[in-house]
């Protein structure tokens, strides 16, 4: 292990994570069908604080994110503060970094603690694929503005006369990159072809993810980090993730047809993450504050890094770019890690990133490094399953990865973990965590 570099405050305090919690993750239009992301965010933050019997007056800041924005509540963080009984003086702002949003929220709180401006903070994210901001066409939107300014019936009728039936159709949120028009699935398909990721290998990874997640729930390993969510009108509840295939078989995956390239593709609904609803949060503070309040520390943020690459090709290669930076900042190598948690947006994207971890050619041509960071030991990789099984509420996944890693390190008696994710826009994130 090379020289250690640990994130600290000016007073020498490490950045501690005291608690992490999430809702169960639910497939679109199931358990959280009519529950907005804001309500899920309030639910998980309030439950986390209640479990700790935490004095809300101790909280200095809340940073939260949401990828699929709610127009009526653009600052989800502030609404969570106001909706959970925290003092109105608690600072709150929202962030968005696509699928790495809660990674960004956690990094922001960590930086505030390091700067000494915050002692206690909450970070996290929530997203709903069931309660969506359905928009209108640009032509209808422009006409509505013009109607508001029209003064006579004749002017209004003239505006209406220019509209066609197609202009009145609802417009769902975009699923493609604004700059390229490519969807995440199309990029996943491109990465599979470019890096020779077979359908069989993708299906095998998906089967592994579902099998390990099934076992994790059966063994009770997730009970402390996943709350039971009681839903209005409080006649039902959800206590486990409902996307996990408990009877997963490799043969079952082979039956599905490709989605994004129907003739020659390999990416299917089974080896990709589904649209998912859920929320996750972590409670952070300086090490000395945690000890002064008498709370057990789950772990520490050792380092973090973000990366950005082109979006035309290999847009989801963020982990392979961000991880070497985070490892260098932590003063460690890949071999020093006890756990590796990588967001499985698609099996093809995950396997392509794993390949690049071990590729000297990739390191030399894309990272400016003489050699690769190393091959991933599968005994350390996504040991409880990953996003392919749990699902992926965009803004919540980073907090899930970090919480899940710290609890697993604790069960194993300590160590170091890497959590990393790709994100839309060619972005990537990586965190190195240290068990308390």
From Swiss-Prot:
Q: Which reaction does it catalyse?
A: an acyl-CoA + acetyl-CoA = a 3-oxoacyl-CoA + CoA
Q: How does it assemble?
A: Heterotetramer of two alpha chains (FadJ) and two beta chains (FadI).
One GO BP annotation of this record: fatty acid beta-oxidation
Functionally, this protein is described as follows: Catalyzes the final step of fatty acid oxidation in which acetyl-CoA is released and the CoA ester of a fatty acid two carbons shorter is formed.
Q: One Pfam family, short name please?
A: Thiolase_N
Metabolic or biological pathway, per its Swiss-Prot or TrEMBL entry: Lipid metabolism; fatty acid beta-oxidation
Q: Does this UniProt record's set of keywords contain Cytoplasm?
A: yes
Task: Please state what the protein is called.
Answer: 3-ketoacyl-CoA thiolase
**Which coarse location class describes where this protein primarily resides?**
cytoplasm
């Amino acid at each position: 292990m090379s020289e250690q570099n640990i994130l600290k405050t000016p007073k020498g305090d490490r950045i501690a994570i005291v608690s992490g919690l999430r809702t169960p993750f639910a497939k679109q239009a199931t358990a959280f069908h009519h529950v907005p992301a804001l309500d899920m965010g309030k639910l998980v933050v309030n439950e986390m604080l209640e479990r700790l019997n935490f004095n809300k007056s101790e909280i200095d800041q809340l940073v939260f994110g949401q990828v699929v924005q709610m127009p009526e509540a653009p600052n989800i963080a502030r609404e969570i503060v106001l909706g959970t009984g925290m003092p109105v003086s608690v600072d709150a702002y929202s962030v968005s970094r696509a699928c790495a949003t809660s990674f960004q929220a956690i990094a922001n709180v960590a930086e505030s603690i390091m700067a000494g401006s915050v002692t206690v903070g909450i970070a996290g994210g929530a997203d709903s694929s069931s309660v969506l901001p359905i928009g209108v066409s640009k032509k209808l939107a422009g006409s509505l503005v013009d109607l508001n300014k029209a003064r006579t019936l004749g002017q209004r009728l003239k505006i209406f006369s220019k509209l066609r039936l197609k202009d009145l159709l609802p417009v769902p949120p975009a699923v493609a990159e604004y700059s390229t028009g490519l969807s995440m699935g199309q990029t996943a398909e491109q990465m599979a072809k470019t890096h020779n990721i077979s359908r069989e290998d993708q299906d095998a990874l998906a089967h592994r993810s579902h099998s390990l997640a099934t076992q994790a729930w059966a063994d009770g390993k997730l009970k402390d980090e996943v709350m039971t969510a009681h839903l209005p009108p409080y006649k039902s509840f959800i206590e486990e993730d409902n996307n996990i295939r408990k009877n997963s078989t490799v043969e079952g995956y082979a039956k599905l047809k490709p989605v994004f390239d129907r003739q020659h593709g390999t990416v299917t609904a089974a080896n990709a993450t589904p649209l998912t609803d859920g929320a996750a949060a972590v409670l952070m503070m300086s090490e000395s504050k945690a000890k002064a309040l008498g709370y057990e520390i789950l772990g520490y943020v050792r380092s973090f890094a973000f990366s950005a690459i082109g979006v035309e090709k290999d847009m989801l290669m963020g982990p392979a770019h961000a991880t070497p930076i985070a490892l260098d900042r932590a003063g460690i190598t890949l071999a020093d890690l006890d756990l590796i948690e990588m967001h499985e947006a698609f099996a093809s994207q995950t396997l392509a990133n794993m390949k690049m971890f071990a590729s000297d050619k990739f390191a030399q041509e894309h990272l400016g490094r003489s050699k690769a960071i190393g091959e991933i030991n599968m005994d350390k990789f996504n040991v409880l399953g990953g996003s392919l099984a749990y699902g992926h509420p965009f803004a919540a996944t980073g907090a899930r990865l970090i919480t899940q890693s710290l609890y697993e390190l604790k069960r194993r008696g300590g160590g170091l973990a890497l959590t990393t994710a790709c994100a839309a826009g060619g972005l990537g994130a990586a965190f190195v965590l240290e068990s308390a």
